[in-house]
């Protein structure tokens, strides 16, 4: 007695097609019964710390004040520009803050009082302090990260509460 099966091409296609049809029929039933993962599965939401930067009355026009935010390895600067700007806070809506790390290669920028820009000495990128850190010229492809400030009229305190944009060299601003 021989244990071999004589299968023709036509027979093979019929058996294979039947198997595919059964799998296609059962697949939606199995996926309907599968447990759905929550929409935010695998995501972690980290809160920015609230850190007092300065008191508004202590800031002088075009005199940058250094601080670190959201942690001690992130140098930032707050500047009173002297005229109201979009996103500005304080009694005259003229106080802004930025990370000083250039978004191109992470070199520290410096504030230029005459042009109200942040200039990177490494590759000559310039960022406009009056226009939300917008890149004016140079190698960077992103604006300078803006530190979000909250102003409390009662205490005149300026508090950093977040960052708009990714600080150079990070996958997330809060670590």
UniProtKB/Swiss-Prot annotation:
Catalyzed reactions: 2 oxidized [azurin] + arsenite + H2O = 2 reduced [azurin] + arsenate + 3 H(+)
Enzyme type, top EC level: oxidoreductase
Family, as annotated: Belongs to the AOX family.
Keywords: 2Fe-2S, Disulfide bond, Iron, Iron-sulfur, Metal-binding, Oxidoreductase, Signal
EC annotation from Swiss-Prot or TrEMBL: 1.20.9.1
Superkingdom of the source species: Bacteria
Required co-factors: [2Fe-2S] cluster
Residue pairs linked by disulfide bridges in the UniProt entry: 107-122
Molecular-function GO terms, alphabetical: 2 iron, 2 sulfur cluster binding; arsenate reductase (azurin) activity; metal ion binding
Signal peptide: 1-32
Keyword Lyase recorded: no
Subunit structure: Heterodimer consisting of a large and a small subunit.
Membrane-crossing segments per the record: none
PTM annotation, UniProt: Predicted to be exported by the Tat system. The position of the signal peptide cleavage has not been experimentally proven.
Name listed for the protein in its UniProt record: Arsenite oxidase subunit AioB
Naturally occurring in which organism (per UniProt): Alcaligenes faecalis
Free-text comment on the cofactor: Binds 1 [2Fe-2S] cluster per subunit.
UniProt-listed SUPFAM superfamilies: ISP domain (SSF50022)
Keyword Cell inner membrane: no
Gene Ontology cellular-component annotations: membrane
Function: Involved in the detoxification of arsenic. Oxidizes As(III)O3(3-) (arsenite) to the somewhat less toxic As(V)O4(3-) (arsenate).
Residues given in the record as [2Fe-2S] cluster binding sites: 102, 104, 120, 123
InterPro entries for the chain: AioB/IdrB_ssu, Rieske_2Fe-2S, Rieske_2Fe-2S_sf, Rieske_Fe-S_prot, Rieske_Fe-S_prot_C, TAT_signal, TAT_signal_bac_arc
